Every structure is written in structure tokens, then in C-alpha cells.
Amino acid sequence: MPETATNDAKRDRRQAVLDAALDLFAERGFNGTAVPEIAKRARVGAGTVYRYFESKEAIVNTLYRLHKQALTSGILAQLDPTLPAREQFRVYWQGMAAFARNHPKAFRFLELHHHGPYLDDESRALEQQVIAIARTTFEHLREQQIVKDVPAGVVMAIVHGAFVGMIKAKDDDYLDLTPHALDAAEQCVWEAVRR
């Protein structure tokens, strides 16, 4: 077999393991998922899983960093600091919505695992970088008297909590998340945090 075909097959098996693990971690969580289940879902042997990842923790951390970076870079690529604060907030909200819509399993996975004790130092550092960006942004908006005079963490919790709650309501079939509903929710959350 040519070297290129061998490399493609290895990449495909590794990706199959990651895809299966994402499905299972999003469905069952970290503790509810065993490596043999990942192997079965990926249609590979358990030994193949361990050829690419030394442990279940290595798999969850690989997935966490991959999807956290995708979410963050997707939002940051759209943000324009020259826009008024209100428009920046809309872009941020729409960026989260686009990621949740286009990558629902990845979004669910990130929400289940962002505080897991199994995250390694690199994954925790990435989470802290993302939090620092949001914190700095909301602190700047508070200093400009655009958002309420409360700690940035409070504003972040309100915004993030409302968004995640809305996505969970949609996933549980309690909410039909139409574009109009998404825009209305964004307006309500902005009204909750603005001065």
C-alpha cells in the first residue's frame, strides 16, 4: 500500500475514533463512556483507540481543544472592534448560535465538559484564555458605561447562561428556535445587561 494511502487510512481511523467519542461524550458524558464503547462506535478495535490516544482523558482533551478553538476562532473572526458595542454583542450572539446550529454535538460536548476534573492543563489554559477575552471585553464595556456596573463575571454568566438555557430548551423540544426567536432572545439578553 502506498504511503499516502496508509496515512489516509490512519487519519480516517483516528477521525472515526474522535467522531465516535464526540457522539458518546455528548450523549453520556465522560464518566458514562468507556473506551470499548468508543471503539465499537468507531468500528475499530480497542487497541486501535490506544494506538492514537493513550487514554480516555487524552481523547476528551483532544476533542475539547479542537472544538473550543473552533468556537472561539469562529466568533473572533467575525468580531470587528470598530463596530458599536451593540453590534459587537449581536455578532457574538450570532456566532454562538451559528456554532450551536452547525455543530450541535460539539456544542453539547463543550457544555458538558468545560469544568471536568479530567481536563488537562492545556485544556484549562485554553478555557481561561477564552474567559479572559470575554472578561476583558465586558470590563471595557462597563468602563465605557455601556453595560451595567456589575462584575464582568456576572454579565458573562447572564449572557452565557441565557444562551445555553435557550439551546437546552430547543434540544428538549420546549422551544422552536426560529431566527425570530433567536433575535428576540438576543435583544432580551442585551436589555438585561446594558445600562
Task: Put a short name on every predicted segment.
Residues M1-R28, G32-R41, A58:
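Basic, helix-initiating cap at the start of DNA-binding domains
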Residues L76, L110-Y118:
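Short linear capping/connector segments at secondary-structure termini
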Residues R108, L112, R142-Q187:
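Hydrophobic/aromatic-rich alpha-helical bundle segments in the mid-to-C-terminal region
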